[in-house]
Amino acid sequence: MRALITGVAGFVGKYLANHLTEQNVEVFGTSRNNEAKLPNVEMISLDIMDSQRVKKVISDIKPDYIFHLAAKSSVKDSWLNKKGTFSTNVFGTLHVLDAVRDSNLDCRILTIGSSEEYGMILPEESPVSEENQLRPMSPYGVSKASVGMLARQYVKAYGMDIIHTRTFNHIGPGQSLGFVTQDFAKQIVDIEMEKQEPIIKVGNLEAVRDFTDVRDIVQAYWLLSQYGKTGDVYNVCSGIGTRIQDVLDLLLAMANVKIDTELNPLQLRPSEVPTLIGSNKRLKDSTGWKPRIPLEKSLFEILQSYRQA
């Protein structure tokens, strides 16, 4: 059994590669970084925007599964690079779908979307199901909603085997800065090491998000590749909402020093979804998946990853 992970050198890709290896899957991974190396992964240098190269890589490997992770993943950065976000996320996906179609492969594809596709959720719609109306409120959200629509179109028009996820906030050791848990943890450790004044700069702390550990996320991706229904969309989420303020409080309680907070207007986004909590009923019913790693454990391990760096 062969699996291709695009964007394998990214945060989720590394965890997914490790999980697939544990399932005795032969793993191939693409990365823009020629130097990237992962254990038990055959690495391939690839720019997802090079459609001809994408086609050659896929036709050469002939994977049974493709996990399409290569993407621009920052909501915040999407406001600064709207064109780049849309191009990479939408046209990169098109290149993968067309490569599989043109190669006439019998291959299951997982396209990775986001809770940001839902955007403005009304109070009575929470926790949000896959049937909910999409009202994305960021360029990133629009790009991922477009990916989901393309996936559905290729299933209907060409009979391709595609599943689309709407993945909510995922966290864990190794995620890049620019995501809230990492930014908080890095500042706390810098303060502990006296590299920073004992003040954490924060954005909107009232937003409510649905957090899941990345190790639970990749298990969901694997189970969906095995048991998901072609053409369906699946929320990948814990089903539990947590205020950003509460995430910060949990991290501050783990700090070795007293720390104050200060609002940084630069960390506020032009428009922000106030509450995003998902229903994972479809995922659970289809695969038997359930999250195993509690938020507190994820946050502690993120802190420890910076302390040990």
UniProtKB/Swiss-Prot annotation:
GO terms for molecular function: GDP-4-dehydro-6-deoxy-D-mannose reductase activity; oxidoreductase activity. Pfam families: GDP_Man_Dehyd. It catalyses: GDP-alpha-D-rhamnose + NAD(+) = GDP-4-dehydro-alpha-D-rhamnose + NADH + H(+); GDP-alpha-D-rhamnose + NADP(+) = GDP-4-dehydro-alpha-D-rhamnose + NADPH + H(+). Substrate binds at S114, S115, N169, D183, R209, R269, P270, S271, E272. Keywords: NAD, NADP, Oxidoreductase. NADP(+) binds at F11, V12, R32, D47, I48, A71, K72, S73, Y140. Transmembrane segments: none annotated. Its EC number is 1.1.1.281. Belongs to the NAD(P)-dependent epimerase/dehydratase family. GDP-6-deoxy-D-mannose reductase subfamily. This is GDP-6-deoxy-D-mannose reductase. It comes from Aneurinibacillus thermoaerophilus. The lineage of its organism: Bacteria, Bacillati, Bacillota, Bacilli, Bacillales.
